[in-house]
Amino acid sequence: MIIKVRVLPNSKNNEIVSRIGTVLRVCVTTKDVDSDETNNLVKKIVAEFFGVKEKDIYLRKGQRGKEKTIEIEGKSDEEIKELLDCIP
């Protein structure tokens, strides 16, 4: 399943904070949204939340911006939608 992510840099914690429609808002402690460190951190946060391995998270678009498109494998679309519904 493909989801959109909005990265919020310079945060105190690394976490998913909310969802606006189908866009996840992810806080990261890194300063730059365009670094490999930030991209890997976003993948790690998303993988932990959805209960999949980091290798099952693919960054499809937005490697250098705040808006990223991520593909999640290893769970059905139904399971992912259920987890998305848990986010305020």
PLM feature spans:
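Contiguous, often N-terminal, cationic amphipathic patches that form binding interfaces
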Residues: 1-44, 52, 58-63, 68-88
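The alpha-helix within a helix-turn-helix
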Residues: 47
